[in-house]
Amino acid sequence: MADGLNRVHFNPSTAQLVEFALLRGEGELTANGALVAKTGARSGRSPGDRFIVREPSSEAEIEWGPVNQAFDPGAFEGLWARVEAYLADKELFVSDLEVGADTEHYQPVRVTTQYAWHQLFARNLFIIPEEFNRKNKPVWQIINAPDFVCDPARDGTNSDATVILNFAERKVLLAGLKYAGEMKKSMFSVQNFLLPAQGVLPMHCSANVGKDGDTTLFFGLSGTGKTTLSADPKRFLIGDDEHGWAPGGVFNIEGGCYAKCIDLSQKNEPVIWDAIRFGTVLENVVMDEHRVPNYKDSSLTENTRAAYPLEHIAQRKEDNCGAEPHAVVFLTCDVSGVLPPVSILTKEQAAYHFLSGYTAKVGSTEIGSTSAIQSTFSTCFGAPFFPRPAGVYAELLMKRIESFGSQVYLVNTGWTGGPHGVGKRFDIPTTRAIVDAIVSGELKDVETVHLDTLNLAVPVAVTGVDSNLLNPINTWGDKALYTEYAQKLAEAFTKNFAKYQVSDAIRNAGPKA
C-alpha cells in the first residue's frame, strides 16, 4: 500500500522491495536471485558513532563509557526532528515488525527506511508477526536515513553519521549510515537492556536443536563460527546470532540470519549457500561479469554479508524457540595458537571465560580496524551490544547454568601450531567433529588432561579428530616457544580480569600467570 502524498509504502512485500531497489538504483540482481547492495566507506559497524540518550529512567543502570556513550536528550530531540523534516518529502518504506520470538518478551517496532533494500533487510532480520503487537505494548520506532548528513557542531555527533538509542522514548535513530547491520544490532542492544529486568539472559549466540529436542548454544564474536556451526544439516536451526534464555527455554530475538560470506563455499557451508536466493540481501559482495557472486573477493571489505529470513532454511525450528540448553559452547578465535580446540569448563570457569570473552576480531566487522585479525577481550562475547554492567549478564548466566545443569565448553576456531601467520587455522570439518561430540554427549565424563598454565581440562580423544591436535603443545615445532606464548596469554587474561569484582572461586578459575 502506498500513500500518494509523500509516497509511503506500508508493509511492502519482498518482491515489491526488490523491484523498488532495482528501479531506484540501490542494488543489482545476482545470478542466484539475491539483491546485492553496497554500503560505501562504512562497511561495518561504527562503534565510535553509537550513543545512548542519558535520561533519568535508565541512567543509573547503564555502564557509561566508550562503548555506551552518553547523548544529551535535548540534542536528540532536535536531531530526530531534523531527520523527520529531511524525510518528509522522500519516498519511504515502513513496516510493523517485532523483536523477540517469545510471546511475553517481544518488543514491537515500526521501522521507517529511506532505502528499499534497508527495509528488505529489516523484514528479513526482524520478525514479521501474524498479528502485530498482540499484547498492545508501547511501540519502538526506528528511523534509518542513510543520506542525511550529520553536522557534529550542530547535532552533537562525533562525525557525519550516528546511531542513537533512546530508552525513555523508545526510539532508535540511524543517520548517515548505509551498513544495514546497525539496525539489527541497535534492537539487540535494546533487548540487552530490557530483558535482564525480566529475569531473561540476552545472549550474543546462535542456537540449534537436535531431533530429540536437545538445544545447543554457540557464543562468539562475529566471524568466530556462530552462524557456520549452528547451520548444521543434522540439526534444526533456532537462530544464528541473538537469543534470550528465560526460565524454561530459549528464544530467538530475530527472524533471520546475517551470515558472513567471505570464502563461503557450498561444500563447507551448504545451509548458508542454499539460503542465498531471491529475497536475500548480499552486502558488499562482488559479482563477475555474469552476475555470479565471487565470495572470495574482499576488495570492498572482508565483512561481506548475506541477510536472509529463517524461512530460507529448510531445517529450522519454526517457532524460533527451544528448550533450555544441555550444551553451551563458547567460541574463541585464538590468534596466538595457544588454546586447545576444545576444553570442558566448570561453572566457575564458564563465568570467568564469559566475562573475559577472549577471542579475535575477524574480518573487520567494525570500521577503522587496523588489521583483519586482532586479539581482543570482548565481555560476554559481545561487549559492543550490552548496555548494563557485565556482572549483570554473568550472574544471569551462572543462574541459568546452575538451574538447568548445562555443560559449558570452550572451543577454539582459531590457530594451532603457532600464532596467526605461522600456524594454521582449525578447519571447519575438525570443529564440526568437535561440535558433534559435544551435542551427542560424548564429552561428558571423558578422560581429560589438565593444561596447568591455561587451567583447562582437555579431552584425550574426540571421535573424528586427530588426537595430536587436542593438546596444542603437540602441534608446535618449538615446545619452549609454545610455553612462552601460553604464559603470555595467561598474563593477558589475568591483566584483563583484574577489573572485575568477583568471588575467589571465579577469579581462580582462569589461567595461571
From Swiss-Prot:
The residues that hold substrate are: 45, 179, 185, 305
A Pfam family per the record = PEPCK_ATP
Q: Could you tell me the superkingdom of the organism this chain comes from?
A: Bacteria
Binding positions for ATP per the UniProt entry: 185, 204, 220-228, 269, 305, 431
**Its Gene Ontology biological processes?**
gluconeogenesis
PROSITE patterns referenced in this protein's UniProt entry, alphabetically: PEPCK_ATP
Q: In which pathway does it act?
A: Carbohydrate biosynthesis; gluconeogenesis
Cofactor(s) of this protein: Mn(2+)
Stored SUPFAM superfamilies: PEP carboxykinase N-terminal domain, PEP carboxykinase-like
A Gene Ontology molecular function term of the record: ATP binding
EC class, as a word, reads: lyase
Places the protein is found: Cytoplasm
Which cellular component appears as one GO term in the record? cytosol
Q: Which UniProt keywords apply?
A: ATP-binding, Cytoplasm, Decarboxylase, Gluconeogenesis, Lyase, Manganese, Metal-binding, Nucleotide-binding
Annotated residues for binding of Mn(2+): 185, 204, 241
Q: Per the record's keyword annotation, is Ribosomal protein included, yes or no?
A: no
Q: Which family does it belong to?
A: Belongs to the phosphoenolpyruvate carboxykinase (ATP) family.
Q: What does this protein do?
A: Involved in the gluconeogenesis. Catalyzes the conversion of oxaloacetate (OAA) to phosphoenolpyruvate (PEP) through direct phosphoryl transfer between the nucleoside triphosphate and OAA.
Q: Which HAMAP family match?
A: PEPCK_ATP (MF_00453)
User: How is this protein organized at the quaternary level?
Assistant: Monomer.
Protein name (record): Phosphoenolpyruvate carboxykinase (ATP)
What is the species of this protein? Shewanella baltica (strain OS155 / ATCC BAA-1091)
